[in-house]
């Protein structure tokens, strides 16, 4: 259990550090989801409760939110805590759906769902009244706009797709 928690923390920290402009570690975003993907696979192989995937995704995205949007506390501490919590609750959902798809339908469909769920969630996050558009995966390159001049054609969602696919490729290369 502690090992699984460590992988959640690692994924959250890698994601968070890939957004920090001061150190410009954006390449970390290309491997940040790999520990979570490994963790999800362990939960699936060990036939553990699917709720564990949700809990671990919540840990990943709580850390990610705290590292990237810590500055919200300057406005109000309670507002920051609510933003951290509710954003993590929502972002964990597509990762849980990915796990359920893998578990009940199959691996291939699960990995397709992984891509679709994340991109669909990001689209919904842009277009609902409580929009929180700061943290799509494609925004990891904000400190290096020269890397993403092609966003002119694809938007940030193209960058998110890039990040998701590279994480999957790295994961399959490691596993």
Where are these regions (language model features)?
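Membrane-embedded alpha-helical bundles of multi-pass enzymes
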Residues: 1-175
């Amino acid at each position: 259990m502690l090992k699984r928690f460590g992988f959640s923390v690692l994924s959250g920290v890698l994601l968070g550090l890939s957004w920090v402009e001061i150190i410009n570690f954006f390449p970390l975003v290309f491997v940040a989801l790999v520990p979570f993907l490994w963790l999800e696979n362990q939960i699936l192989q060990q036939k553990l409760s699917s709720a564990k995937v949700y809990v671990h995704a919540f840990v990943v995205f709580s850390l990610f939110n705290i590292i990237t949007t810590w500055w919200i506390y300057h406005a109000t501490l309670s507002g920051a805590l609510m933003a951290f919590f509710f954003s993590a609750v929502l972002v964990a959902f597509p990762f849980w759906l990915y796990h359920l798809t893998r578990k009940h339908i199959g691996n291939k469909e699960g990995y397709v769902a992984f891509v679709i769920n994340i991109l669909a969630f990001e689209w919904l996050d842009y277009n609902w009244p409580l929009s929180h558009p700061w943290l799509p995966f494609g925004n990891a390159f904000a400190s290096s706009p020269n890397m993403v001049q092609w966003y002119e054609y694809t938007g940030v969602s193209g960058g998110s797709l890039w990040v998701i696919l590279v994480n999957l490729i790295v994961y399959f290369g490691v596993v």
